[in-house]
């Protein structure tokens, strides 16, 4: 949500930065009177829709298959996918876009795909080129340079600060392990990251699980969550 100041008043109101599927459907219904408008999303996911004229408003991942394919696929709110605080945000955005775009008719049959986004961004370029391999190679090169998976192996240790510190203090990590953090986690907890070369992944995992076992044996009060190669780092 984005803050909006009301003219002439000192109060602030919040408005949604991303228009929901239902609101979008209502607006398009008024713009195209007489055209059937269907929604597919959190409340109800449609598996398919009949051919013929109509509008389908779907949230990412809930796009129904249209009989004969869609005449046009419009990808909106691209920034909402691309700006997520997630190492795989670009990868996930491209996956969802390509899945939605694949539901359009072939270009030779009049099918069109339009993405509302900055065309210079790598995921958008990959979509325009229809080249996920190019994007994957680029991502791998960047992650290798920055020291992120899959170029290295990582583990996250999440819990209250004292419990995380206790587990790491008791872990006999490989000598070349790097401990990064802390970074904020959900519900007031924190997360530390352990990074090792790919060849040392087994040693890292064994050390962390042994330390977790020691805490469990002495019935430590605060739990700690361990994840090797977590999907979310930050």
Where are these regions (language model features)?
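Short beta->alpha linker loops
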Residues: 19, 43-44
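Conserved phosphate-handling catalytic cores of large alpha/beta enzymes
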Residues: 93
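Cys/His-rich short segments
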Residues: 1-30
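Accessory helical-bundle/CTD segments and flexible terminal tails appended to RecA-like ATPase motors
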Residues: 4-5, 31-35, 44-90, 99-234
């Amino acid at each position: 949500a984005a803050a909006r100041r009301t003219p002439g008043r000192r109060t602030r109101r919040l408005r949604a930065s991303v228009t929901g599927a239902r609101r979008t459907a209502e607006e398009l219904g008024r713009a195209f009177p007489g055209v059937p408008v269907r929604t597919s999303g959190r409340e109800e996911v449609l598996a398919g829709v009949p051919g013929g004229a109509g509008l389908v408003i779907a949230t990412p991942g809930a796009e129904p298959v249209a009989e004969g394919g869609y005449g046009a696929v419009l990808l909106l709110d691209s920034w909402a996918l691309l700006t997520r605080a997630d190492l795989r945000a670009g990868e996930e955005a491209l996956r969802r876009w390509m899945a939605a775009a694949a539901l359009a008719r072939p270009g030779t049959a009049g099918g069109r795909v339009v993405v509302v986004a900055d065309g210079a961004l790598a995921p958008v370029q990959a979509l325009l080129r229809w080249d996920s391999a190019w994007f994957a190679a680029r991502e791998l090169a960047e992650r290798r340079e920055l020291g992120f998976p899959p170029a290295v192996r990582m583990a996250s240790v999440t819990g209250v600060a004292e419990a995380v510190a206790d587990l790491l203090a008791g872990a006999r990590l490989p000598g070349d392990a790097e401990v990064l953090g802390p970074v904020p986690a959900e519900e007031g907890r924190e997360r530390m990251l352990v990074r090792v070369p790919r060849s040392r992944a087994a040693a890292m995992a064994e050390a962390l699980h042994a330390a977790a076992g020691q805490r469990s044996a002495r019935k430590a009060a605060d739990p700690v969550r361990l994840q090797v190669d977590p999907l979310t780092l930050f």
